[in-house]
Amino acid sequence: MPSSTPPALFPTLYLASQSPRRQELLQQIGVRFELLLPRPDEDAEALEAELPGEAADAYVRRVTIAKAEAARARLVASGKPASPVLVADTTVTIDGAILGKPANADDALSMLTRLAGREHAVLTAVAVIDADGELLPPALSRSSVRFAPASRDAYARYVESGEPFGKAGAYAIQGRAAEFIERIDGSHSGIMGLPLFETAALLRAARVAF
């Protein structure tokens, strides 16, 4: 007679992200995790290079899967115990262009002035590789954000705060940039970098306890 014992749940997962926001969001829903970050010899930024003519949704999905596969290989090489691996990537798009992390202050100011008074899309893809090494179908969260008109000086002061650096589109919705945001339509957590509804569904499928 087949056993009716349910599969064991994993008490923790591996989070392959340095983002404090993603860590805070996982903690918000009670997920326990261990960081699984790139080694010094890994070129993590190379995974984020755009392909010619690549659409934003295809880009963010491809990058997320590539990061997940790299993280899984890192886990296997480390000899750590098997457990699901979570990866996410966020990008901002407007007029068909992908706005990643600004390279410098001028780049950040250029991005922000481009967003001023307009609506743009924020895409976050989430991928989970289960403890057996299988990639679950990635999830994609798409939200719209409208920036109110603001002066170039206002954006320049925001850039001087340092907050735009390391953020797709050169802003953080949970930070000082909130003063520029007129409205959003979609997932607030997705705009922050980890859509919790989609993430929770993937973690349940991977048998993560939370």
UniProtKB/Swiss-Prot annotation:
Its cofactor is a divalent metal cation. This is dTTP/UTP pyrophosphatase. InterPro entries: ITPase-like_fam, Maf-like. Keywords: Cytoplasm, Hydrolase, Nucleotide metabolism. Belongs to the Maf family. YhdE subfamily. It catalyses: dTTP + H2O = dTMP + diphosphate + H(+); UTP + H2O = UMP + diphosphate + H(+). CDD domains: Maf. GO terms for cellular component: cytoplasm. Its EC number is 3.6.1.9. The active site is at 89 (proton acceptor). Nucleoside triphosphate pyrophosphatase that hydrolyzes dTTP and UTP. May have a dual role in cell division arrest and in preventing the incorporation of modified nucleotides into cellular nucleic acids. GO terms for biological process: nucleotide metabolic process. GO terms for molecular function: dTTP diphosphatase activity; UTP diphosphatase activity. It is found in: Cytoplasm. The record marks 21, 90, 174 as: Important for substrate specificity. It comes from Burkholderia lata (strain ATCC 17760 / DSM 23089 / LMG 22485 / NCIMB 9086 / R18194 / 383). Its main location: cytoplasm.
